[in-house]
Amino acid sequence: THHASSAASDVYKRQVMWMAAGFTMLEAGFVRRRNTAEIVTKNIGLYSIACFMYLLCGFMVMYPGANEGGIIPPYDFGFGSKGQEDFGMNTDLGYADAADFFFQVVFVATAVSIVSGAVAERMNQWAFFALAAFISGVIYPIQGFWNWGSGFLNAAGYSDFAGSGTVHLAGAACALAAAIFIGPRVGKYSTGKVNKLYGANIPIAALGTFILW
């Protein structure tokens, strides 16, 4: 039964991982043609950064196994610090801890991808990569601990089964803050009026929408 649960979760997380293609095509389709290559590069880069930061410290911060009901989890580095024996089956969860790591890492990349769409054509690529590292290694794990890691929201009875708050609301909050701080895209209001900025490829954007759907 546990092996079946791990196999099923493996299918689900691969589907979530496929959302990265949807985000990439959606963004690349709606930005101006001159920025499409940067958008594709940015989405590949953010996925790599999210995976690295969550492996480096994010997973252990989100699931510290301590400070239940707390707000700030203890900070630890490296998924490997759990010990090799803990990579295997977790009978409390019904699947392997390593499988849970993969499941969560595609979620953190999804949250960062939401931010990517909000700052498209607004933010320097390297500055965005730094922001992606901060979200993946600090913001997402801490707020994820509040619920899924047995923090204070979990203790209060809050339930977020599919990540509407932990993933999507967290990503949306970061996206809104970034958009407000940075301001509009260059050229949007350059003449004192609202200028139309045409997307590079609407069919590609539509395909990305359906992949996400």
Locate each region found by the language model.
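Short, well-ordered junction/capping motifs at the entry into regular secondary structure
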Residues: 1-2
